[in-house]
């Protein structure tokens, strides 16, 4: 990715989010190697888990290694089920200097039967200043999604986090393979849903953030 950026006329991608297993004893060594790349900004680790006792956010080794994110001044992309949000809040509060980015709109899959639960989770976690929200991934869990369906989530997310702490993303090619949706269809829906935003607000959620 760094090679691609170096050769691109606009230096895209201008930021790289990598992976390090924070439960691994070599986590610090892996992070040090990543730091050699100019555009490296943070890591992403999938923490989705429906078994509370096995949740990595309760693992002492994982929590100890998480201090490395703070040490290297990196961001952390957090992918969880929204039912895990209270554990996530505990972790986020422990590391107030780390910028957290909640992935895929706090994964609302279970909200089909508990929309109020997802809404509560979004509103509570948005109360933490060091958290931003990435709005994406609907096609990965809702194969027959449509603009009206995802607008319910997007409007609540924007209201909770505000345009300064939200960003839109495509989740491609994963969404393409699962929902058979085109890249353009997601962006067309996003633009339609956010048509009420001012130019500055739209620039924030689609470019600057």
Regions found by a protein language model. Give the residues of each.
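Active-site gating loops and adjacent loop-to-helix segments of metal-dependent hydrolytic enzymes
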Residues: 36-50, 98-99, 129-132, 182-190
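Active-site glycine-centered loops adjacent to acidic/histidine catalytic or metal-binding residues
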Residues: 171
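Active-site gating/metal-coordination segments in enzymes
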Residues: 1-83, 90, 134-141
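Short, electropositive alpha-helical surface patch
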Residues: 1-12, 95-102, 152-161, 183-193
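Catalytic pocket-lining loop regions of alpha/beta-barrel enzymes
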Residues: 55-167, 176
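Mid-to-C-terminal alpha-helical segments outside catalytic/metal-binding sites
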Residues: 156, 161-167, 178-209
């Amino acid at each position: 990715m760094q090679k691609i950026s170096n050769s691109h006329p606009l230096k895209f991608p201008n930021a790289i989010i990598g992976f390090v297993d924070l439960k691994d004893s070599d986590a610090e060594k892996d992070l040090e190697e990543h730091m050699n790349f100019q555009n490296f900004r943070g890591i992403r680790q999938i923490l989705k888990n429906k078994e509370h006792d096995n949740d990595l956010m309760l693992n002492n080794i994982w929590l100890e290694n998480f201090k490395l994110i703070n040490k290297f001044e990196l961001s952390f992309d957090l992918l969880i089920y929204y039912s895990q949000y209270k554990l996530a809040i505990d972790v986020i509060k422990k590391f107030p200097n780390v910028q957290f980015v909640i992935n895929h709109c706090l994964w609302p899959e279970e909200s089909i039967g508990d929309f109020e639960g997802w809404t509560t989770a979004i509103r509570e976690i948005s109360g933490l200043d060091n958290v931003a929200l990435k709005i994406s991934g609907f096609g990965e869990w809702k194969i027959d999604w449509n603009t009206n369906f995802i607008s319910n989530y997007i409007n609540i997310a924007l209201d909770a986090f505000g345009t300064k702490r939200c960003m839109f993303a495509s989740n491609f090619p994963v969404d393409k393979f699962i929902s058979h949706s085109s890249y353009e269809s997601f962006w067309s829906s996003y633009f339609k849903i956010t048509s009420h935003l001012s130019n500055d607000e739209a620039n924030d959620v689609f470019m600057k953030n």
